[in-house]
Protein backbone atom coordinates (compact mmCIF):
# COMPACT_ATOMS: atom_id res chain seq x y z
CA UNK A 1 0.00 0.00 0.00
CA UNK A 2 1.15 3.50 -0.83
CA UNK A 3 0.47 6.52 1.36
CA UNK A 4 -0.86 9.86 0.18
CA UNK A 5 -1.02 13.18 2.02
CA UNK A 6 -3.11 15.96 0.46
CA UNK A 7 -2.50 19.55 1.56
CA UNK A 8 -4.85 22.25 0.32
CA UNK A 9 -5.13 25.90 1.21
CA UNK A 10 -5.29 29.45 -0.11
CA UNK A 11 -2.39 31.34 -1.64
CA UNK A 12 0.58 32.15 0.60
CA UNK A 13 -0.65 29.85 3.36
CA UNK A 14 2.74 28.12 3.37
CA UNK A 15 1.42 24.82 2.06
CA UNK A 16 4.21 24.23 -0.48
CA UNK A 17 7.04 24.85 2.00
CA UNK A 18 5.30 22.72 4.62
CA UNK A 19 4.47 19.93 2.16
CA UNK A 20 8.04 19.80 0.85
CA UNK A 21 9.50 19.57 4.37
CA UNK A 22 6.97 16.97 5.51
CA UNK A 23 7.77 14.85 2.45
CA UNK A 24 11.50 15.03 3.11
CA UNK A 25 11.11 14.05 6.77
CA UNK A 26 8.89 11.10 5.87
CA UNK A 27 10.96 10.05 2.86
CA UNK A 28 8.01 10.60 0.51
CA UNK A 29 7.88 12.10 -2.97
CA UNK A 30 6.66 15.69 -3.15
CA UNK A 31 4.73 17.53 -5.84
CA UNK A 32 3.17 21.00 -5.94
CA UNK A 33 0.36 21.17 -8.47
CA UNK A 34 0.94 24.89 -8.80
CA UNK A 35 4.17 24.08 -10.62
CA UNK A 36 2.22 22.27 -13.31
CA UNK A 37 0.02 25.27 -14.04
CA UNK A 38 3.11 27.48 -14.05
CA UNK A 39 4.78 25.09 -16.50
CA UNK A 40 1.72 25.29 -18.75
CA UNK A 41 1.88 29.08 -18.53
CA UNK A 42 5.59 29.12 -19.36
CA UNK A 43 5.09 26.95 -22.45
CA UNK A 44 2.27 29.23 -23.59
CA UNK A 45 4.42 32.30 -23.11
CA UNK A 46 7.60 31.14 -24.84
CA UNK A 47 5.69 29.59 -27.76
CA UNK A 48 3.08 32.35 -27.97
CA UNK A 49 0.20 29.92 -27.66
CA UNK A 50 -3.37 30.60 -26.66
CA UNK A 51 -5.29 28.16 -24.46
CA UNK A 52 -6.85 26.31 -27.39
CA UNK A 53 -3.46 25.68 -28.98
CA UNK A 54 -2.02 24.59 -25.65
CA UNK A 55 -4.76 21.98 -25.27
CA UNK A 56 -4.07 20.69 -28.78
CA UNK A 57 -0.31 20.28 -28.40
CA UNK A 58 -0.05 19.41 -24.71
CA UNK A 59 0.71 15.74 -25.33
CA UNK A 60 3.51 16.60 -27.74
CA UNK A 61 5.38 18.85 -25.32
CA UNK A 62 8.67 17.52 -23.96
CA UNK A 63 8.51 18.17 -20.24
CA UNK A 64 8.82 16.24 -17.02
CA UNK A 65 8.40 16.74 -13.30
CA UNK A 66 10.87 15.01 -11.01
CA UNK A 67 12.55 15.52 -7.65
CA UNK A 68 10.87 18.91 -7.07
CA UNK A 69 12.17 20.13 -10.45
CA UNK A 70 10.37 21.03 -13.67
CA UNK A 71 12.05 20.37 -17.02
CA UNK A 72 11.02 21.65 -20.46
CA UNK A 73 12.97 20.36 -23.48
CA UNK A 74 15.42 18.94 -20.89
CA UNK A 75 16.10 22.42 -19.47
CA UNK A 76 15.41 23.07 -15.78
CA UNK A 77 12.77 25.83 -15.65
CA UNK A 78 12.04 25.49 -11.91
CA UNK A 79 13.30 28.99 -11.11
CA UNK A 80 12.07 30.70 -14.28
CA UNK A 81 8.43 29.80 -13.60
CA UNK A 82 8.49 31.56 -10.23
CA UNK A 83 8.26 35.08 -11.69
CA UNK A 84 5.10 37.12 -11.14
CA UNK A 85 4.09 37.27 -14.81
CA UNK A 86 4.08 33.48 -15.07
CA UNK A 87 2.25 33.25 -11.75
CA UNK A 88 -0.55 35.51 -12.99
CA UNK A 89 -0.91 33.61 -16.25
CA UNK A 90 -0.95 30.32 -14.33
CA UNK A 91 -3.67 31.66 -12.05
CA UNK A 92 -5.81 32.53 -15.07
CA UNK A 93 -5.18 29.13 -16.64
CA UNK A 94 -6.25 27.36 -13.46
CA UNK A 95 -9.79 28.72 -13.89
CA UNK A 96 -10.19 26.96 -17.25
CA UNK A 97 -12.15 23.67 -16.86
CA UNK A 98 -10.40 21.94 -19.78
CA UNK A 99 -6.95 22.90 -18.53
CA UNK A 100 -7.81 21.67 -15.03
CA UNK A 101 -9.12 18.37 -16.37
CA UNK A 102 -5.90 17.86 -18.31
CA UNK A 103 -3.79 18.81 -15.30
CA UNK A 104 -5.64 16.55 -12.86
CA UNK A 105 -5.03 13.47 -15.02
CA UNK A 106 -1.30 14.19 -15.05
CA UNK A 107 -1.24 14.89 -11.32
CA UNK A 108 -3.00 11.61 -10.56
CA UNK A 109 -0.52 9.76 -12.77
CA UNK A 110 2.39 11.29 -10.84
CA UNK A 111 0.90 10.04 -7.57
CA UNK A 112 0.58 6.41 -8.67
CA UNK A 113 2.72 3.70 -7.10
CA UNK A 114 4.56 5.97 -4.69
CA UNK A 115 4.27 7.53 -1.26
CA UNK A 116 3.58 11.20 -1.88
CA UNK A 117 2.77 14.56 -0.34
CA UNK A 118 0.94 16.79 -2.80
CA UNK A 119 -0.20 20.37 -2.31
CA UNK A 120 -2.56 22.63 -4.19
CA UNK A 121 -6.12 23.89 -4.05
CA UNK A 122 -8.12 20.81 -5.01
CA UNK A 123 -5.96 17.89 -3.91
CA UNK A 124 -8.20 16.47 -1.20
CA UNK A 125 -11.40 17.15 -3.12
CA UNK A 126 -10.43 16.20 -6.69
CA UNK A 127 -6.88 15.00 -7.38
CA UNK A 128 -6.34 12.61 -4.46
CA UNK A 129 -9.85 12.12 -3.12
CA UNK A 130 -8.83 8.88 -1.42
CA UNK A 131 -5.71 10.24 0.31
CA UNK A 132 -5.37 8.76 3.79
CA UNK A 133 -4.42 12.13 5.30
CA UNK A 134 -5.85 15.46 4.20
CA UNK A 135 -5.12 18.93 5.49
CA UNK A 136 -6.50 22.39 4.84
CA UNK A 137 -3.78 24.86 5.79
CA UNK A 138 -4.99 28.40 6.34
CA UNK A 139 -3.97 31.71 7.95
CA UNK A 140 -5.38 35.21 8.18
CA UNK A 141 -4.87 37.31 5.01
CA UNK A 142 -2.67 39.79 6.89
CA UNK A 143 -0.41 36.99 8.13
CA UNK A 144 -0.18 35.51 4.65
CA UNK A 145 0.71 38.93 3.26
CA UNK A 146 3.53 39.27 5.80
CA UNK A 147 4.87 35.84 4.89
CA UNK A 148 4.71 36.52 1.17
CA UNK A 149 6.58 39.79 1.64
CA UNK A 150 9.28 37.97 3.60
CA UNK A 151 9.55 35.26 0.95
CA UNK A 152 9.96 37.87 -1.78
CA UNK A 153 12.39 39.90 0.31
CA UNK A 154 10.15 42.95 0.12
CA UNK A 155 10.18 45.62 2.82
CA UNK A 156 7.06 47.77 2.64
CA UNK A 157 7.74 51.42 3.37
CA UNK A 158 4.08 52.29 3.84
CA UNK A 159 0.94 50.75 5.27
CA UNK A 160 -0.81 51.52 1.99
CA UNK A 161 1.55 49.26 0.04
CA UNK A 162 1.08 46.46 2.55
CA UNK A 163 -2.71 46.81 2.45
CA UNK A 164 -2.55 46.52 -1.34
CA UNK A 165 -0.83 43.16 -0.91
CA UNK A 166 -3.52 42.09 1.57
CA UNK A 167 -6.18 43.14 -0.95
CA UNK A 168 -4.42 41.14 -3.67
CA UNK A 169 -4.47 38.03 -1.49
CA UNK A 170 -8.15 38.50 -0.66
CA UNK A 171 -8.90 38.90 -4.37
CA UNK A 172 -7.04 35.68 -5.14
CA UNK A 173 -9.05 33.92 -2.42
CA UNK A 174 -12.28 35.15 -4.00
CA UNK A 175 -11.21 33.90 -7.43
CA UNK A 176 -10.11 30.50 -6.09
CA UNK A 177 -13.25 29.88 -4.05
CA UNK A 178 -15.73 31.05 -6.70
CA UNK A 179 -14.41 29.45 -9.88
CA UNK A 180 -16.71 26.89 -11.49
CA UNK A 181 -13.98 24.31 -12.08
CA UNK A 182 -12.81 22.65 -8.85
CA UNK A 183 -13.05 25.67 -6.51
CA UNK A 184 -10.92 25.92 -3.39
CA UNK A 185 -12.88 24.26 -0.60
CA UNK A 186 -11.96 22.21 2.44
CA UNK A 187 -12.57 18.49 1.97
CA UNK A 188 -15.10 17.16 4.54
CA UNK A 189 -12.49 14.75 5.92
CA UNK A 190 -9.59 17.23 5.94
CA UNK A 191 -7.93 18.43 9.13
CA UNK A 192 -8.13 22.22 9.37
CA UNK A 193 -5.00 24.03 10.54
CA UNK A 194 -4.94 27.79 11.12
CA UNK A 195 -1.24 28.60 11.16
CA UNK A 196 -1.68 32.29 12.01
CA UNK A 197 -0.21 31.74 15.48
CA UNK A 198 1.94 28.71 14.69
CA UNK A 199 5.54 28.57 13.54
CA UNK A 200 6.51 26.78 10.36
CA UNK A 201 8.20 24.05 12.40
CA UNK A 202 5.13 23.54 14.59
CA UNK A 203 2.95 22.91 11.54
CA UNK A 204 5.50 20.49 10.07
CA UNK A 205 5.87 18.57 13.33
CA UNK A 206 2.11 18.27 13.71
CA UNK A 207 1.71 16.75 10.25
CA UNK A 208 4.73 14.47 10.53
CA UNK A 209 3.61 13.10 13.90
CA UNK A 210 0.09 12.45 12.63
CA UNK A 211 1.42 10.77 9.50
CA UNK A 212 3.67 8.47 11.50
CA UNK A 213 0.74 7.54 13.72
CA UNK A 214 -1.76 6.98 10.91
CA UNK A 215 0.68 5.18 8.61
CA UNK A 216 2.44 3.36 11.47
CA UNK A 217 5.85 4.52 10.25
Swiss-Prot record:
Q: Does the keyword rRNA-binding apply?
A: no
Q: What is this protein called?
A: Cytidylate kinase
What residues does ATP bind to? Answer: 9-17
Q: Which InterPro entries match?
A: Cytidylate_kin, Cytidylate_kinase_dom, P-loop_NTPase
Sample GO molecular function, one term: dCMP kinase activity
EC number(s) given by UniProt? 2.7.4.25
The terms describing its cellular component in GO are: cytosol
Q: Matching PANTHER family, A to Z?
A: CYTIDYLATE KINASE, CYTIDYLATE KINASE/PANTOATE-BETA-ALANINE LIGASE
Which GO biological process entries does UniProt record here? nucleobase-containing small molecule interconversion; pyrimidine nucleotide metabolic process
HAMAP family, alphabetically?
Cytidyl_kinase_type1
Record family assignment: Belongs to the cytidylate kinase family. Type 1 subfamily.
